[in-house]
Amino acid sequence: MNKITNASRFLFEELVSRIQERSKAVGIAVAIVDRNGNTQYEKFFGYRDQERKLPIDEDTIFGLASVTKSFVALSIMQLVEAGKVDLDDPVSKYIPEFTNRNQKPIKVWHFLCHTAGFYPMHRTIINEIAQKAGLDENETGDFAFCEKIALEGTKAVAELLDAQTKENGGLIGDPGNYMSYCNDGFGLLSEIVRRVGGENSFAEYVKKHILEPLHMERSSGEYVCKTGSGCECGNSLQNAKRCHDLRQRLP
């Protein structure tokens, strides 16, 4: 690995600062790790909690957001390796709620590669599912480990995707031919993991089959960070104004 010089460090940090300003990011953590697992560079910009002026540091826990898809993909491939899932199987084999009506079968690998053919659509949000189902996290426990949420969410996602697979052709093209990013496709994949993997929730599967074997003790599939755990506060922009979301899911 090329050595990081003072000049390159300065240019890099200037770039990160510009990105932070342009994106209105409250805080950013950056690290460069070599192939041997040695940290060659780390730097923390801004706050994990802007209101309380708590800075980001090496112990700050971030939500993984869409990097969660990597855990979904790894889980699916573990089940493929175990002979429990076939990438060429139609998704409807594992998720019969997804009828995939009047279209060529959408297979497991299509969702993994974002090539199922769906147009971008409203993302299914767990809080919306809970509200419609009349579920309270104080009663059910963490939503990430709640079977009822998984079932209700699967039903909602399947209906949403099925609405595009109509006789008049609601897809971008035949499955496998076009790339179109699909969050909800990975939602159905995570449900395949839950149903086939033998755990009560996708989060529990990841905990037992990925995080614990790798000794990732500060990582979890929890939907909301526990207070005081060093989590970064979720932030979003609405009408160019910053607002707080729920505390981020633990990575």
Where are the regions that the model predicts?
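Penicillin-binding protein/beta-lactamase superfamily catalytic region
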Residues: 165, 179, 193, 197-200, ...
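Loop/turn elements at helix/coil->beta-strand transitions in domains of secreted/extracellular proteins
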Residues: 25-28, 36, 106-109, 217-218
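Stable alpha-helical elements in mature extracytoplasmic
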Residues: 8, 12, 87, 104, ...
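Proline-centered turn/helix-capping motifs that create local helix->coil transitions or kinks
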Residues: 120-123, 218-222
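Active-site-proximal loop and beta-strand segments within enzyme catalytic domains
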Residues: 49-183, 200
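Well-ordered alpha-helical segments within folded domains of soluble proteins
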Residues: 72-73, 184-191, 244
